[in-house]
Amino acid sequence: MNPTELDSDVFAQDVDNQKARELREMLNTQDFVFAPGMYHALDARLAEMTGHDAAYMSGYSTVLGQFGFPDLEMVTMTEMVENAKRMVEATNLPVIADCDTGYGGIHNVRRAVREYEKAGVAAVHIEDQTTPKRCGHIAGKQIVSREKAKARFEAAVDAKQSEDTVVIARTDAYGSSNGDWDEHVERGRIYADAGVDIVWPEMPNPSREDAVAYAEEIHETHPDLKLAFNYSSSFAWSEEEDPLTFQELGDLGYKYIFITLFGLHSGAHAVYEDFKKLAEQDEEGQFDLEQRYLDHPTESHHELSFVSRYQDIETEFDPEARRRIEESEGFSEEQADPITSNDDD
């Protein structure tokens, strides 16, 4: 057979993106969908335990939390997809993932969308910065031309293997070295016409006026367009006289709201304080931590990791597993409480 007779789109697969359908349903029926930013599987599970709508794999959180790097596109597409896959497998929530600029040209963008879909991600966001990109709140960012950006988003939409997968287009025009407010708004219109599901206008500060103005201006021409809002961890929201509320943003049409580095800041602050106490007070640091996590939903790392389920699977297939569990010490369904030396034998 001649190679020209083969199906040339062998890298495309039929993907049934159930989580994307769930996300779309929430976007269409709720005032807004909120997802805290995070970077690892346990955070995704904790988001589900605490009642969130979705889990957001933040790019900055991933590169800092997993690699210790700044958000300067120093991590590859495959590394990002692998992290997203781990999060997808750890939760029943829809996972929304940072796809940066698509990691190169048109072919890279298309591959990135498909790899994220195969990993089980419900939505991806792609931005219009030049490559390598940087966090939207690190000085020095530039945007590609309108033509290149439009092609990038059209390629992303066309590459979808499931019609349900949500594509979010981010524009960094406002605050970039070669953009301005008018470009910010016009690019949102261009990207909407390119077929994306949601437009995310990255803002350089927590201005209420800018958020309101953007929604009003773009909805003059695209009244049904859904917007995304980054309630950014780079901003001091608590110091604003009248900070935007999630409900206000939802009413303006910002249907997807997220805090990019919430999980990282929450974790880093807690770990720093506890490590510091441990360094200064030795075992008292452990005692203090125990007083806070005992009888808390996060008390047992065994329960957080579903050890009982894995033990059940083990006993189903290994005839000796039940005997070993019953005759040895350690966590089991019969011994699930934290271990002390006073436990009865």
From Swiss-Prot:
Keywords: Glyoxylate bypass, Lyase, Magnesium, Metal-binding
Stored PANTHER family: CARBOXYVINYL-CARBOXYPHOSPHONATE PHOSPHORYLMUTASE, CHLOROPLASTIC (PTHR42905:SF5), PHOSPHOENOLPYRUVATE CARBOXYLASE (PTHR42905)
Entry annotation: catalytic residues: C135
Classification via CDD domains: ICL_PEPM (cd00377)
Residues noted as binding substrate in the record, renumbered to the chain: S58, G59, Y60, G136, H137, R170, N230, Y231, S232, S233, S234, T260
EC number of the protein: 4.1.3.1
Required cofactor names: Mg(2+)
Family: Belongs to the isocitrate lyase/PEP mutase superfamily.
Activity as a function of temperature: Optimum temperature is 55 degrees Celsius. Very little activity is found above 65 degrees Celsius, and the activity at 40 degrees Celsius is 50% of the maximum.
GO function term, MF aspect, one: metal ion binding
GO BP of this protein: glyoxylate cycle
Protein name, per record: Isocitrate lyase
Pathway of action: Carbohydrate metabolism; glyoxylate cycle; (S)-malate from isocitrate: step 1/2
UniProt biased composition (Acidic residues): 328-345
The organism of origin for this protein: Haloferax volcanii (strain ATCC 29605 / DSM 3757 / JCM 8879 / NBRC 14742 / NCIMB 2012 / VKM B-1768 / DS2)
Binding site for Mg(2+): D98
pH dependence: Optimum pH is 7. Very little activity is detected at pH 6.1 or 8.0.
Matches recorded under Pfam families: PEP_mutase (PF13714)
Class in the EC hierarchy, top level: lyase
Record text on subunit structure and interactions: Homotetramer or homotrimer.
Function: Involved in the metabolic adaptation in response to environmental changes. Catalyzes the reversible formation of succinate and glyoxylate from isocitrate, a key step of the glyoxylate cycle, which operates as an anaplerotic route for replenishing the tricarboxylic acid cycle during growth on fatty acid substrates.
